[in-house]
Structures are given as C-alpha cells and as structure tokens.
Amino acid sequence: MREDPIDIVVGLGWGDEGKGATVDALVAARGVGNTLRFNGGHQAAHNVIADGVHHTFSTFGSGCLAGAASWIGPRCTIDPLAAVNEQRALSRALAGGGWDGRPGAPDSRARPPAPPDSGTGRLDPPGAPGTRGAPDSPDRRRPTPPPAPRVRVHRDALVTTPLHVIVNRARESARGPERHGSTGTGFGETIAYAHRGFAPLRAGDMGDPDLIADHLALYAERSDLIESVDAAWLARMAQDLRSCFARVYDVVTDEELLDMIATGDVVMEGAQGLMLDQDLGTHPHTTWSRTTPAWAVELCERAGVGRRVRVVGAMRTYATRHGRGPLPHEADLGVVEAHNTTSRWAGEFRTAHWDAEVLRYALDRVRPDVIALSHLDVFDDVLMSAPGETVGLPPVLVAAHGPDRRDRTLAG
C-alpha cells in the first residue's frame, strides 16, 4: 500500500485548466498505477503532451501515457461508440510506426477521435475509423506493440447512446440565440433521463443486446423530440453498442473499485471546473455534474483512506471559458490555443483576466490543499483584473512553464 497522498485533481474555473496534464505529471512523477474519473463523462477533453506525444483524453484516464490504468466511477457517463474510436486512435498510433517500445507511448501525430457529425446527429459507425492514424511503418523489426488499452468501468455508470446525442443536439439547436453552450455529446440528456425517474441504461446492462434494445425503444418512446425509430435500426444499434462496449470496457463492482482506491495507488481525475458545477455555477450555463472534490472524497472515505486525500486545484495564469455563459473581465489576451478552438456545439474559446471575487469563490468551495498552476510561459504570474490584487492561493504543487510534461515541475 502506498503511503503518499491520494491526489484529487479538480478545476477552479470553467474547464480547460490543465487537469489532464496535471494528472499525467503526478502519475509520471510518482509512478502511480491507476487514474479514476469520478465525475462528468465522455464530453471531457483533457489534453496531454508527454515528450512530444499528444492525445486528448475523453474516455481513457489522462495517466495513460505514463502507464496508469483507467477507471471510471459510478457517477460518470460513457459512450461506447466514442470510446472505441478513441481506442482505435491510440492503437493505430501504437502500430503505425510511432511506438518506441515503451508501454503507453503512442505516436505524436495521434489525435482524438472525430466527434459525431455536427449537422445530422449521425455517429461514426463502429467500423469506421475515428481519426487518421500515422501511416504503416515499413520497419518490421520493431517490437510488437502492446494491446489496446482498456477501461475498468463501474457497473452503475450511465451509458450514452446515439439517441441521447440526437436529442441533445435537437434541443440545443431549438434554443437558437439562447443556446446554453452544450458540447453536443448527449451527456446532459443521459443524466436528465435518469433524473426523471426512469431506469437508465448502465454499464452493467451492456452484456445483453435485447435489454439494450428495450432501453433504446423506451427512450425513443418517452422523448418529446423523437417521432419514431425503426425496430430493425434499434436492434442493429443495440448490437453495435454491445460490441463496442466489449472492445473497450471491463465492468467492475463497488468492492473492486473500493479495493483499488484502498491501495492508495490512484490519482482521482475531475472533469469540467467549479464554475460549471450543477449547483454552484451560473445557470443555465452549467454541466450536469458536481465538479467539486465531493464525490471523490466520498469514495476515498468509503475505501477507508479519506484522511490521505490531498485536493489539487488546477488553474491557468489567466481565466478561460469554452462556450456561452458569463466570463468576467473577458479580453483578447493574444493567446494561441493549439488544442482549444471554436466548435459548432461548445462555441468559442474565450479568455479573461481573473476576477478576484470569482477566484475566491472557487477556492472557498473547492478548498484545495495545493495548486497546479499552468501557462506560466504565457504570463509569469496570475493575471488579475486589478493589478497588484492577490487572493491568497495555496502552495503550488505543480508549475507548468509549457504544454509538455517535461515543462512541469513538482514541488518537493
């Protein structure tokens, strides 16, 4: 059993604070064997660059490039079709000439899977490649790459289907100029359906295609935005979902998850940021999830290691927001974003000076023990809206002077 702290990484802003890169740095520095996503779902986009290798993590934990196994907790969502595309991207990179023999080191040209078609609600079919990988290498003397990474998912995690995605996009489009800034991945619709009191599709159900088809039919029947669905299509989609799920996921029980946490060999990876919290953010521009450390702390307490928790608050030297909603002191800071661009659903990537009141609010709600401060290569200190203003940040555990893992330094 490890004796060092169990780190819970959460965002202090509106997302894009460097949570994934922080998880990668902590895993690599400490040799941690596991990462656990405890909130949010497949709508996350955590960018990690390790020695020039880039990947955007949505399904897999951000410690994957450093060799950590990926776990998903009971309060998360998963999308089997998106997951198999992401897995394929990693596998293509490993087999395409970029692998150097080290476990978990995909090609630097690997990219995250393409999102579902933004105009029609069509998902990439399970047999279609999600990204264009590196070309096959003519060098046949390379060692055989490791098998495709897999994800251990709690049996209670909710499953997003193409129907959730279609309804999500139709609902968001109908809002017109009042759009909320949805990611268009069906995450909110998946959570909302469960909150309505219906029995949702969960990871533990994914071994039975008939049960999956029944869930799809009931969801379509109950939706106010789906007129009709062909029964044959439902049967095919149920088989596709089951097949994709089996290729990526291994279902685990409460006991298995808590046993892993009890070893202390884990970094807990949060998604989104405090200012998007379902209860603490500014409605309606929020997510359907708690973005504080609460759910991770709860799991650690149930596993008997609650006293070892260390909360790591991730933030940039400046504030950002991807999509609609309030962003105090918004300004064009002249920052070039390599991996955050305007998208049809999330919207524009925006920047701002930090508002002292907002930052104090986030610190008060999250109560981080330490900070992971990124983009120190862009601004050498936290960029406040009022020059010289301070907010009393906790000690910096991880300082990032660039996007790569090698640009990050850990205190102590």
Stretches found by the model and what they are:
Residues 1-99, 141-412:
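Non-transmembrane, aqueous-exposed alpha-helical and coiled segments at domain scale
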